[in-house]
Amino acid sequence: MLVGVVYNHPQPLPYGEAKDKISEDAVLEEVSDVQQALRDLGHHVVLLPLKNDIAGFVQKLSSTPLDCVFNICEGAYGCGVHEMNLPALLELLRIPYTGSPPMALGCCLDKATAKRVLLGAGLPTPSFKVVQTRFEPVGPLPYPLIVKPSREDGGRGVSGESVVYDEAALKERIRYVLEKYRQPALVEGFIDGRELNVSLIGNDSPETLAISEVEFTKLPNGFPRILTYDGKWLEKSREYADTPVTCPASVDASLKRRLEEISKKAFQVLGCMGYARIDFRVDVKGEPYIIDVNPNPDISRKAGFAKSAEKSGLTYPQLIQRILNLAINRFSTFKPAEPVRIRKMEEEDVPSVLNLLDSINAFKRMEVAVAREVIEAYLKKPEGGDYSIYVADYLENQAAGYICLGPTPLTEGTYDIYWIAVNPRFQSQGVGKKLLRFAEQHVRSLGGRKIIIETSSKKEYEAARSLYVAHGFKEVARISSFYASGDDKIIYEKNLSN
C-alpha cells in the first residue's frame, strides 16, 4: 500500500509558554516511528507535512495516489483548534485515513463540550464551569479545584499551581489561563486520588488495552497529586522523575470492569474511531471520573499507548498495521464517483488529453509539445506503429487519464511507458493504478518480458514515482543531473516474468 503520513510540521506557537514547543516538536519522533513501522511492514510511505502553504499541501495530497493517510496531525499554525480540519479535508477528497473523524476531534479538544456529552450519556466526570473573563463568578464548586485551558491537550497549561484551594488562587490561575493561552479557562472539581489511563482500539466496538497508572508516591509533600506538563514532557525535570507510569496498573476486577465499560461507552458517544485514550481520576471511594478523552494520542514507540498495546500482546508494527486496517475497513465505500473504462485513443480525444497535460504543473510546455507530436504520430498509424495510446474514459468531457507505451527499439520483449498522466480531478481515485495495470496486461498479452519507465528526480514527480514503486517497479539506475543540474534521470523496471 502507498500510505501518506500526515503531520503538523512544528511551527512557532501563537500563545502559551515557551516550553510548550517541546510537545509541538515531539510529533517528529512519532512520525519517524510510524514511518519506520510502515516500511518494516512492506508499505510505501510518503511524508506529507502540513506547514503554512495550505494550498500546496492540498495539491500534493490530492495528486498523490494514496491508499490511505496515517493521520497524526494535531493542528495547524501551531494551534490545536485546526486539528479537526485535516480529516474533514480528507473526507472531501475521499481519501481513507486513520483515527477519529472531525466531529470527535473537535468535540474532545473542547473539554467542556466533551464533558457535556459525557454527562448527557450518564458518564461520570467532575463538576465544572467554563470561565470566559477574569470577573466571571465560578459558582458553588467546592474546593479544591483545578484550572486548565479549555482547548488544549498534551498537558499544556497544567502545573502545580493549577490546583487551587481558595478564591485568591483561583482568580490568579484563571487570569493566567486567559492571558497566557487566550482561551476560556476550565474550572473543575479536583479528584485527589489515583490517575489511570485506558487505551482503546477499534471502530464501532472498540476493545480496551492494558490499563496504565501515573504513580504519585514520589511527589514531595504539599505538591498536588497530578501529572503536569513538565511531568509529561521535560525529561530532566523533577516532576518527570516523580510521576512514572506503570503498565499494567494494579486494579481489582471490579474497578477494571467499570473502567472498561465507561471507556467503551465514552469512545462511542463521542464518535471516536480507530484508537483513543481516556484518562480517569479515582476518588477515595473507588469511583472513577473521566478527566480527559484524547482521540488522537501520541503513538510513538515510547508513548503510553504503544506500551499498553505491547502489554496486551501487540508489537509496535502490529499496532500500526491494526490501526491502518481499521481505517481501510471503515472507508471501504470510498470509490471513484464513476467507473473508469480504458480504451484506445481516438482523434476526438486530442483536445481533452492536451488539456489534461496542460493542467498538470509538473509538465513543461516543451514536454507537452513533445507529447502532442507523439499523439500525432500515433494517430497516423494507430496499428503497428511505435506507440500505443489509451485513455481512461471521459469525466464531463475531460479524459480521466491517459497512457502511452511502446516496444523499446532494438530489444526483444522490452517495453517503455513514455507517458502516464491523470486528470487532477480524478487523482487519488485509483485511475493511475488502473492505467498501469492495463499497460502491464497489454504488454503481457504481446509476450513482453519487462517494462521500463524513465522519470525525473524533481519533487514535482514524487507522486508519480510513489505510484510506480507501489505498483512493483524498482529503481535500477540513476543518471545524475541528466535533465538539468540537480535533476536526475531515474529508471524504473518491472520484470513481468516474476
Language model: regions and residue ranges:
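ATP-binding N-terminal substructure of ATP-dependent carboxylate-amine bond-forming enzymes
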Residues: 1-96, 103, 107-109, 132-137, ...
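Active-site nucleotide/adenylate-binding loops and adjacent lid/helix of ATP-dependent enzymes
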Residues: 1-7, 62-63, 105-195, 204-205
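Phosphate-binding site of ATP-dependent enzymes
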Residues: 69, 167-261, 284-289
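ATP-dependent carboxylate activation and anion-phosphoryl transfer catalytic cores
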Residues: 86, 119-122, 250-339
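Conserved catalytic-core motifs of GNAT/GCN5-like acyltransferases
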Residues: 129, 454-457, 469, 474-490
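Acetyl-CoA-dependent GNAT
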Residues: 340, 344-418, 423-425, 436-438, ...
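Conserved acetyl-CoA-binding loop-helix of GNAT-fold acetyltransferases
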Residues: 428-441, 466, 470
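Conserved GNAT acetyl-CoA-binding A-motif
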Residues: 443-456
